[in-house]
Swiss-Prot record:
Biased composition (Acidic residues): 373-383
Organism encoding this protein: Bos taurus (Bovine)
Record's keyword annotation contains Transcription: yes
Role: Transcription factor required for TBX21/T-bet-dependent maturation of Th1 cells as well as maintenance of Th1-specific gene expression. Involved in embryogenesis and hematopoiesis.
Bias (Low complexity) ranges: 125-135, 409-420, 441-474
Keywords: Differentiation, DNA-binding, Homeobox, Nucleus, Transcription, Transcription regulation
Gene Ontology molecular function: any one: sequence-specific DNA binding
Chain residues forming the annotated DNA-binding region: 276-335
GO biological process: embryonic digestive tract morphogenesis; enteric nervous system development; epithelial cell proliferation; liver development; negative regulation of T-helper 2 cell differentiation; organ growth; positive regulation of epithelial cell proliferation; positive regulation of organ growth
Protein name per its UniProtKB record: H2.0-like homeobox protein
Bias kind Basic and acidic residues: ranges: 334-349, 363-372, 390-401
Pfam (any one): Homeodomain
Listed InterPro entries: H2.0_Homeobox_TF, HD, HD_metazoa, Homeobox_CS, Homeodomain-like_sf, HTH_motif
GO cellular component terms, A-Z: nucleus
Length: 486
């Protein structure tokens, strides 16, 4: 109903009309009574305005019109000195409209409500009617539901602490600000604490601490006054922190990364796990046996055979197809495992079969050597016809030769073979060539025996040494039979 520019004009005219028609001054009087009790209660009824000056002495329609016009012009000129007003020459019921001033004075704030505009124009009127001592008194307290008007001539500076709205949040306080996105708060481990902190800031950030809001209605004031920033926030957030659902929701934090994790985590059901579109088929023992028998016969089934088998066992074609695929995979794996097992078994048997061969050779050779030793031992006393003292003496020298070193024993054996071969060549002939060629213990023994048969005197002094396992190196060649017979 009231525009921004015309609101002060109509509000002031309503108060001036009632004061002008109810005053006790004459037709030319433009002054207002100082006694507020003498002024009638303002009424906006048309009948009261028409019959306002009936009982006044000397009041004429012309004088009434002139008085009201003069009063309007005087008051508007004092209230708005920057604007030019014209006196209303017509009836006071249809006043001439006045154009709103282009420049708004500093003492009058823009876009005020009609109630505050009427109070603003009525307050300077009371200051003009009162004296200087009365102007030093503090202004009356404002009514409940009305805002405190600023003093005339003072610049209105908005105070964020006195306004009902919270101050503008910084970029760090914004939920999706740049500073917060770039920080480490979007880590999944910190998301739960950030959600509770944001909820606390939303509940307690609407009203700063210690701010009185007189302009609010009693219900709204009691509501905001009951919101204690510490007790109420802790009372609201305590069931959230103790809710067992939060522990379940920790496993769904990474399902929706980014800012949507906060929005979807609270609305997500506890059983979020997606159900599979297919269920695992459970076969009976009869069906499993029928499939196994067919698999033993035929690893790959054709489509007609598969349909026939499915009809016989009461299964679907897809179930039989999947079963054969899985069974073939299992068969391949078992086949590969068996082949690897056989390969490892063969590799383990090869070292165990070839190891006893070197140990068996000495056992086979030992009887021949022992037989040769027995022959030499039995032939020496019989052929030489030595006394017991001579045999003991030769055995002692032989033991001393063997006890010194292996090299000396082999050298002594070669020298003995050479000496016995020389004597044998002179007596019997033909034994020396063979004895020089052989260096083994068997050859020396045979040479010694042949030499002893031919010449007994030479062999009595130096008999051939007894062969042993560690005395001389063994030749892999078989020992030939001696040329000289008994």
């Amino acid at each position: 109903m009231f525009a921004a520019g015309l609101a002060p004009f109509y509000a002031s005219n309503f108060s001036l009309w009632s004061a002008a028609y109810c005053s006790s001054a004459g037709p030319g009087g433009c002054s207002f009574p100082l006694d507020p009790a003498a002024v009638k209660k303002p009424s906006f009824c048309i009948a009261d305005i028409l019959h306002a000056g009936v009982g006044e002495p000397g009041a004429t329609p012309e004088g009434l019109a002139g008085a009201s016009a003069a009063a309007l012009t005087a008051h508007l000129g004092s209230a708005h000195p920057h604007a030019s007003f014209q006196a209303a020459a017509r009836s006071p019921l249809r006043p001439t409209p006045v154009v709103a001033p282009s420049e708004v004075p500093a003492g009058f704030p823009q876009r005020l409500s009609p109630l505050s505009a009427a109070y603003h124009h009525h307050h300077p009127q009371q200051q003009q009617q009162q004296q200087q001592p009365q102007q030093q008194q503090p202004p009356p307290p404002p009514r409940a539901g009305a805002l405190q008007p600023p003093a005339s001539g003072s610049r209105v500076v908005p105070n964020p602490h006195q306004s009902g709205s919270a101050p503008a949040p910084s970029s760090k306080d914004l939920k999706f600000g740049i500073d917060r996105i770039l920080s480490a708060e979007f880590d999944p481990k910190v998301k739960e604490g950030n959600t509770l902190r944001d909820l606390t800031s939303l509940l307690t950030g609407g009203r700063p601490a210690g701010v009185h809001l007189p302009g609010l209605q009693p219900s709204a004031g009691q509501f905001f006054a009951s919101l204690d920033p510490i007790n109420e926030a802790s009372a609201i957030l305590s069931p959230l922190s103790s809710n067992p659902r939060n522990s379940v929701q920790h496993q769904f934090q990474d399902t929706f990364p980014g800012p949507y994790a906060v929005l979807t985590k609270d609305t997500m059901p506890q059983t979020y796990k997606r159900k599979r579109s297919w269920s695992r088929a459970v076969f009976s023992n009869l069906q499993r046996k029928g499939l196994e028998k067919r698999f033993e016969i035929q690893k790959y089934v054709t489509k007609p055979d598969r349909k026939q088998l499915a009809a016989m066992l009461g299964l679907t074609d897809a179930q039989v197809k999947v079963w054969f695929q899985n069974r073939r995979m299992k068969w391949r794996h078992s086949k590969e495992a068996q082949a690897q097992k056989d390969k490892d078994k063969e590799a383990g048997e090869k070292p165990s079969g070839g190891a006893p061969a070197p140990d068996g050779e000495p056992e086979e050779r030992s009887p021949s050597r022992s037989e040769g030793e027995a022959e030499s031992e039995s032939s020496d006393p019989e052929s030489l016809d030595m006394a017991p003292s001579d045999t003991e003496r030769t055995e002692g020298t032989e033991r001393s030769l063997h006890q010194t070193t292996v090299i000396k024993a082999s050298a002594a054996g070669a020298l003995l073979a050479a000496s016995s071969g020389g004597s044998g060549g002179s007596g019997g002939g033909g034994g020396g060539g063979f004895n020089f060629g052989g260096l083994s213990s068997g050859s020396t023994t045979s040479a010694g025996s042949s030499g002893s048969h031919s010449s007994g005197g030479a062999s009595e002094l130096l008999p051939a040494p007894q062969p042993s396992l560690s005395s001389a190196p063994k030749s892999p060649e078989p020992v030939p039979a001696p040329l000289g017979g008994l």
